[in-house]
C-alpha cells in the first residue's frame, strides 16, 4: 500500500477540495492518461485497485505511471464515542485531487487495449474521469 514513510505531524487538517489543479495537468511520461474532472479524495486502496485493473488487462509490454500519492491522513473517531477528548486516530491516507489532474499515465503499443485498460481503471476511482492522449494537448 502507498503510505508515507515518515510525516512531521501525525494528524493534519482536512485539505480543501475547491479550485482546479495548478500542476500535473499534462500527459508527460506515457502516451495516454486518466484526467480527473471533479474534486475527490482518492485513498491508497483505490489507487492500488486501479493499478491492478490496468495491469491485469494489458498483461505485459506496457508501462504504467502513477502520478498521485496519498500523503494526507484522514482521521475518524470510533463509532459510539462522545464528542470531545481529542482528535481520532488516522483512518486512511488520501490524495487530494482537484479537477484537471492527471492520475495515471500509460504507454502501450496497441491503442484500443490501452484505452480499455484505462477505462477499467477509471471505474475504480471515486470521481468522474476522462481519458486523454498526449497529442490532444497543445
UniProtKB/Swiss-Prot annotation:
Q: Does the keyword Iron-sulfur apply?
A: no
Q: Where is the composition biased (Basic residues)?
A: 1-16
The subunit field of the Swiss-Prot or TrEMBL record says: Part of the 50S ribosomal subunit.
Q: Which HAMAP family match?
A: Ribosomal_uL16
Under what name is this protein listed?
Large ribosomal subunit protein uL16
Annotated spans, Disordered: 1-23
Which Gene3D superfamilies has this protein been placed in?
Ribosomal protein L10e/L16
Give the originating organism: Corynebacterium glutamicum (strain ATCC 13032 / DSM 20300 / JCM 1318 / BCRC 11384 / CCUG 27702 / LMG 3730 / NBRC 12168 / NCIMB 10025 / NRRL B-2784 / 534)
State the family it belongs to. Belongs to the universal ribosomal protein uL16 family.
Provide the GO biological process annotations: translation
- Which is one GO molecular function term here? tRNA binding
GO annotations of cellular component type: cytosolic large ribosomal subunit
Free-text function comment from the UniProt entry: Binds 23S rRNA and is also seen to make contacts with the A and possibly P site tRNAs.
Q: Which UniProt keywords apply?
A: Ribonucleoprotein, Ribosomal protein, RNA-binding, rRNA-binding, tRNA-binding
SUPFAM superfamilies in the record: Ribosomal protein L16p/L10e (SSF54686)
Pfam families documented for this protein: Ribosomal_L16
Amino acid at each position: 500500500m502507498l503510505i508515507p514513510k515518515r510525516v512531521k505531524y501525525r494528524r493534519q487538517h482536512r485539505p480543501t477540495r475547491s479550485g482546479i489543479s495548478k500542476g500535473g495537468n499534462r500527459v508527460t511520461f506515457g502516451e495516454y492518461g486518466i484526467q480527473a474532472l471533479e474534486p475527490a479524495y482518492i485513498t491508497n486502496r483505490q489507487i492500488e485497485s486501479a493499478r491492478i485493473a490496468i495491469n491485469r488487462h494489458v498483461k505485459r509490454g506496457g508501462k504504467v505511471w502513477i502520478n498521485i500519492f496519498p500523503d494526507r491522513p484522514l482521521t475518524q473517531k470510533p463509532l459510539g464515542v462522545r464528542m470531545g477528548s481529542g482528535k481520532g486516530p488516522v483512518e486512511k491516507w488520501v490524495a487530494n485531487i482537484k479537477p484537471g489532474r492527471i492520475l495515471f499515465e500509460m504507454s502501450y503499443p496497441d491503442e484500443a487495449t490501452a484505452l480499455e485498460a484505462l477505462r477499467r481503471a477509471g471505474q475504480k476511482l471515486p470521481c468522474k474521469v476522462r481519458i486523454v492522449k498526449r497529442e490532444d494537448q497543445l
